[in-house]
Amino acid sequence: MNDAKLKVRACVFDAYGTLFDFASAATGCRDVLGDKTGALTALWRDKQLQYTWLRGLQGRHADFWQVTADALDFTMESLGVVDAGLRTRLLDLYRTLRCFSEVPEVLKELKQSGFVTAILSNGAPGMLADAVSGAGLGALLDHVLSVEQVGVFK
């Protein structure tokens, strides 16, 4: 087989859990959550993914922001955390999740090596724009692609 056909030209990443630390929202509320921080993070993420799978199977798409809020509501109720202000704070923090510490340098090295860099995510376009901007990654990404254009979670 011709080596030119095998040449990698682009590196495409998932956003949440790969570039952005979804745990950073709950960690940012540790002052209120205390020892429930880890449990909230784990259950919120599990429900978020489960809701995307269920919606896909049922053909009932909703954007990832709605799924994220629904998963948080379930999680807070399950953990007995009833606090509208905390809910708002968690969702605000989720829109601007921290990226993992190595991400900027890795993306920079990939760009300098000539690779096209991109995100392909379940995230809604606005969520992704906020996360990329908040983490200062805009200049390091060539494309930010959301499943919203096709209306089906990956």
Region spans (language model):
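Hydrophobic packing residues within well-ordered alpha-helices of enzyme cores
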Residues: 26-30, 103, 128-132
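Short, acidic loop-to-helix structural element flanking the phosphoryl-transfer center
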Residues: 61, 65-66, 83-119, 125, ...
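Substrate-recognition "cap/lid" segment bordering the active-site pocket of phosphatases
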Residues: 118-120, 124-154
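An amphipathic alpha-helix signature
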Residues: 26, 41, 45, 65, ...
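Active-site neighborhood of HAD-like aspartate-dependent phosphohydrolases
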Residues: 1-49
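A metal-dependent, Asp-based hydrolase signature
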Residues: 32, 38, 52-89
